[in-house]
């Protein structure tokens, strides 16, 4: 631990540089301990948790995949995005927002309820290290995650967090603008009484009451570049223009996107349409198949993302009621997918 001596008690400037200062009873000798970025206004309302956990457990045994993943990513952009999450005005201090955000990622990857997540943080050393908790330190209870999610929804941070992580990946060269895949999937509602959700029909499956996640992903890496959440009955072509990123390259999509409005949006953003076509009376079947055949295997790559969500994360239905909470859950799934996908790409 670095030691710094001051001649007299002062207001530490380390609040501007990301460090916590502890003074002795005389105010002369102070120790400086790094901590995650947070604005000065809310810093006293949040707990400070022990980052020494990483050093303690590194000597105890081999690193886990979570340790590798944590070290690979730059968490500073997410920490800055979380600066507006306020702490408790009275009573017990709130948990650090970045630690809580990391805990929600763990809950997404391992399909954990709030109760299961709280228990896992108590028992699993790798989970503690990932979130920044020391070995013998107290961890959040179930209700803390409920309050934190409520704050994320109130402040509207789901999109900001997704963008912050995406910027971090882009700086590491993970997102290359050479092609874009677009698609959507229906996710069931938490309750048939959810008034923000809607029924969606499918020609080969039973109707589903829920929401629809619309995404755009990079053609080669499979990293998600944009995401939007709507009621399940929203048409894909309606949302497509808003999820197509700037300079998208070649844009691949299934027949649901065969519409003039999507073609115009692709061209306006500097891209080239590689959309599959619907059948028409004036279009011979052989010409239609010749157009669609080479596009089909490329377009279908995006379905691996939805497969991961639904099979690995068990994200077949929402946990919470309401569109705002559905958007948060979809963004968390997209962030969790991107982080794990980036880690696997680096290991390949």
Say what each PLM segment does:
Residues 249-250, 255-331:
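Helix-centered, glycine/charged polyanion-binding patches within enzymatic domains
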């Amino acid at each position: 631990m670095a030691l710094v001596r001051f001649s007299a008690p002062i207001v530490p400037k380390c609040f501007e540089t990301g460090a916590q200062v502890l003074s002795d009873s005389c105010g002369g000798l102070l120790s400086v301990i790094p901590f995650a970025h947070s604005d000065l206004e809310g810093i006293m309302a949040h707990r400070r948790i022990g980052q020494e956990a990483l050093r303690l457990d590194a000597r105890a045994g081999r690193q886990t995949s979570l340790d590798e993943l944590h070290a690979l990513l730059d968490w500073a952009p997410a920490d800055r995005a979380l600066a507006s999450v306020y702490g408790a005005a009275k009573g017990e201090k709130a948990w650090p927002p970045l630690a809580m955000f990391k805990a929600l990622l763990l809950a997404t990857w391992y399909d954990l309820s709030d109760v299961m997540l709280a228990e896992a943080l108590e028992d699993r050393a790798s989970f503690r290290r990932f979130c920044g908790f020391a070995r013998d330190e107290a961890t959040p209870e179930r209700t803390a995650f409920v309050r934190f999610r409520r704050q994320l929804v109130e402040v509207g941070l789901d999109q900001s967090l997704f963008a912050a992580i995406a910027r971090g990946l882009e700086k590491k060269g993970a997102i290359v603008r050479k092609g874009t895949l677009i698609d959507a999937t229906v996710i069931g509602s938490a309750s048939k009484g959810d008034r923000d959700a809607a029924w969606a029909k499918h020609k080969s499956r039973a109707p589903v009451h829920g929401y629809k996640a619309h995404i755009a992903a990079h053609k080669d890496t499979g990293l998600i570049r944009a995401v939007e959440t709507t009621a399940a009955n929203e048409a894909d072509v309606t949302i497509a223009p808003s999820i197509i990123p700037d300079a998208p390259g070649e844009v691949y999509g299934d027949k649901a996107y065969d519409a003039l409005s999507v073609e115009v949006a692709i061209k306006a953003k500097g891209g080239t349409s590689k959309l599959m076509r619907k059948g028409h009376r004036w279009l011979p079947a052989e010409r239609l198949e010749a157009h669609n055949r080479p596009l089909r295997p490329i377009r279908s790559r995006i379905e691996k993302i939805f497969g991961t969500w639904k099979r690995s994360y068990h994200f077949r239905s929402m946990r919470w009621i309401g569109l705002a909470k559905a958007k948060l859950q979809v963004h968390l799934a997209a962030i969790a997918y991107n982080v794990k996908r980036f880690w696997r790409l680096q290991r390949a």
